[in-house]
């Protein structure tokens, strides 16, 4: 009796064991399926404009744009205009005479401004810096410093650092990086782990140039945000270069009694200002 009972129990246990293994295998397969199909669809959710505020500032326009991918929200502050009505210039702040971007814009009689390029703790510039035709710091070869924004004969331009060599006729320049948008396309391989305030300079379709900040996004997210087709009424962004970010990120625009302000948290070495061009008498 005991032997028969023992054998009977064994016959029941073995099928149960296999059923459990089968269920565990099925659950594992289902997890793999979810990872394959659902997670990528969440990760690649498209960013869309959910709110836009505009301010006409004479020869330029300013925007405060809120975007979302369904799970995260970022806010863009940007000023944009069309040269030659709008002039870009780099303001050197090596003597610390300006404590913030608002002061730099106001005292320079500019329309708008953002912080400029990278710098050391003692405010020594990192990368090429040219202000008012004077080379403050020379070009550097470094992976991070992949682009140069410069102005020659009041015409702004953005190029890869390896394609830049001649400073003749350049009035203003900032070397920084990485590129965020190139030829209307996002840049692959950008960091997608660290979210922080960002500053950038950009070219939009139709020859419109601008500068702005984003609070707050990873470099990869900002690259995706800047190629949103209806981000700007002037047309999509064609090219964009990342400037110094984090605590340096600051934006200010004033038009009469109206202003848009998102201040930085530290003293910076340089500013990129947008000013009305001097009209001939």
Residue spans for each PLM region:
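Positively charged N-terminal leader segments that act as targeting/secretion signals
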Residues: 7-17
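Sec-dependent signal peptide recognition
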Residues: 13, 30-36
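Short polybasic linear motifs
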Residues: 23-24
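N-terminal signal peptide c-region/cleavage motif recognized by signal peptidases
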Residues: 40-42
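Zymogen propeptides
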Residues: 44-140, 212
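Short acidic-glycine loop/turn motifs at beta-strand connectors
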Residues: 69, 83, 150-155, 182-183, ...
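Active-site-adjacent helix-turn-beta-strand microarchitecture at beta-sheet edges
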Residues: 119-192
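Conserved, well-ordered active-site substructure
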Residues: 123-143, 191-242, 247-281
